[in-house]
Amino acid sequence: LMRFHKFLFLLLLLSSFIQAQNAPSVEKNQFKINVLLPGFVYEYGINNKNTLYSELSAGFGYSSSGFGENWSFYPYIQEQFRHYYNLEKRTAKGKVTSRNSGNFLAMAAYYNFKSITTNDSYSSSNSSVVIAPVWGFQRTYKHKFNLDLNVGAGYGFSKNDSEFVPVLNFTLGWVIGK
């Protein structure tokens, strides 16, 4: 009887260890190329549910007025500490969690460089910083096609101004590598 109890205990211990090994987890390293707003992303898995997300991208703008036409180029860097909170739930429902497909909460920081314009009659926007808590989701589909959306409310400040600002980041692209 004592051997049976030891065997049962060992079996339960081993099965819980095996389950822990199969728990859904974020990728250790993930690279992406964005095409909607051209850019590059690297996401580093800190542990099973948390990542450090780094993005270098650019936005574009066009305006026309009595001063003439103007194209603007807005490079920016974004950093996020992401917590993926629904990986187990997605796995239980048979949904994909690979390549960090899940919902997340994050603390985001953006650095927007001074814009570059094609018409000297238009002034460039100053560099600025935005800090914001955001909610979002990321999905990677067939052929590694990736969609990432996050929204929040933040505080932005520049050399001349500071204010509360809405935050919206939407990217389409591909996961590259494995």
Locations of the language-model features?
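Bacterial Sec-dependent N-terminal signal peptides
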Residues: L1-V26, L172, I176-K178
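Membrane-embedded beta-strands of outer-membrane beta-barrel proteins
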Residues: F40, E79, P133-W135, V151, ...
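Short glycine/proline- and aromatic-enriched beta-strand/turn motifs that initiate or cap beta-hairpins
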Residues: A20-Y76, M107, F113-N119, V175-G177
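Residue-level signature of outer-membrane beta-barrel architecture
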Residues: Y44, H83-Y85, F137-R139, Y155-F157, ...
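Outer-membrane beta-barrel "beta-signal"
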Residues: P75-A92, V165-K178
